[in-house]
Curated annotation (Swiss-Prot):
It is found in: Cell membrane. This is Phosphate import ATP-binding protein PstB. SUPFAM superfamilies: P-loop containing nucleoside triphosphate hydrolases. It is a peripheral membrane protein. Residues 83-325 form the ABC transporter domain. One of its GO terms (cellular component) is plasma membrane. ATP binds at residues 116-123. GO terms for molecular function: ATP binding; ATP hydrolysis activity; ATPase-coupled phosphate ion transmembrane transporter activity. Belongs to the ABC transporter superfamily. Phosphate importer (TC 3.A.1.7) family. Gene3D superfamilies: P-loop containing nucleotide triphosphate hydrolases. It catalyses: phosphate(out) + ATP + H2O = ADP + 2 phosphate(in) + H(+). Pfam families: ABC_tran. Part of the ABC transporter complex PstSACB involved in phosphate import. Responsible for energy coupling to the transport system.
Length: 329
């Protein structure tokens, strides 16, 4: 892996020099814009001020690209991890900070639970891992997220590649209003695979992996919305794993399901960890204990404690962790 990282860094040197050059230009342009705004009238020049502020926002987004050696390729990245997060902060609406100085590792082929009260930052954090939050306007961040040794915010890995490698299953059941088959085949074609036999096999394998094939193999052209809740969630999982991601993110995947469907999904998640690293947001302490290997406790946008699930629930090191898992807070 060390040789691969060195090769990646060498190939990226020229690109970095270009980034540094353009970053200086962007920063200079922002200074000029800010000087111009100070000379404008808020009432009579409102449209021009708005235009300039939009330009500044665009330039600030471009400046997000990092320009130093250490935060593009992490040479000391631990091969036991898939993610290493360092000094990460995140804001909505530019000034509403919701994540504070996050430092943690997510281990390969483990099921890691993110726990904590509603609004503590769990769902925001999990969406940072494949940059879904970047699809929203007026967000910003500082710090570094390394995926398999590469900084996802450096430009070395594009967003489409990242989201293919880091799949997502949402809390709300989200099957497309297509057939069962097309729910999976649609994304396969979008990634440039058009051979009919290849698509058929990928769909079949995804449904098998999601423990759904035997239930739907004779009705693949049935509308996905006619499936039960548990079947719909397994279809969403099949869709997420069809292109063989490294990581599967799950944001409360069983919160909308009954106990029988929940048991089915939990069993599936445990089976999937043989192939994928899984990160799951959950409010269920019982579920965390049943199926996860690692647990990270969030409170008020901060990581309070990280450890094995057994350690967190039997010998928590922090009083806040103990209060939460015991139901006192």
């Amino acid at each position: 892996m060390e040789k691969n990282i060195k090769a990646l860094w060498k190939n990226f040197q020229l690109k970095l020099e270009k980034i540094k050059h353009y970053r200086k230009l962007y920063e200079q342009q922002i200074k000029e814009y800010k000087k111009k705004i100070t000379g404008l009238n808020n009432e009579t020049d409102a449209n021009e001020i708005s235009r300039i502020k939009n330009e500044i926002e665009i330039l600030n987004r471009l400046i997000k690209i990092k320009n130093t050696k250490d935060n593009v390729i992490k040479k000391d990245f631990d091969e036991k991890n898939v993610f290493e997060i360092r000094n990460f902060n995140f804001w909505y609406n530019k000034n509403k900070q919701v994540l504070f100085d996050i430092n943690l590792d997510i281990k390969r082929n483990k099921i890691t639970a993110l726990i904590g009260k509603s609004g503590c930052g769990k769902s925001t954090f999990i969406r940072c891992l494949n940059k879904l939050n970047d699809l929203n306007e007026n967000t910003r961040w500082t710090g570094d997220i390394y995926f398999l040794g590469k900084n996802i915010n450096s430009g070395i890995i594009n967003d489409l590649t990242l989201r293919t490698s880091v799949g997502m299953v949402f809390q709300k059941l989200t099957p497309f209003n297509f057939s069962i088959f097309e729910n999976i085949a649609y994304g396969i074609r979008a990634h440039g695979i058009h051979n009919k036999n290849a698509i058929n096999e990928i769909v079949r394998q995804a449904l098998i992996s999601a423990a759904l094939w035997d239930e739907v193999k004779d009705n693949l052209h049935r509308n996905a919305n006619t499936l039960s809740g548990g079947q719909q969630q397994r279809l969403c999982i099949a869709r997420a794993i069809a292109l063989q991601p490294d990581v599967l993110l799950m944001d409360e995947p069983t919160s909308a399901l009954d106990s029988i469907a929940t048991n089915s999904i939990e069993l599936l998640i445990q089976q999937l960890k043989e192939k994928f690293t899984i990160v799951i947001v959950t409010h269920s302490m019982a579920q965390t204990i049943r199926i996860t290997d690692e647990t990270i406790f969030f409170a008020d946008g901060r990581v309070i404690e990280q450890g094995t699930t057994k350690q967190i629930f039997t010998k928590p090191k922090q009083k806040a962790t103990n209060s939460y898992i015991s139901g006192k807070n």
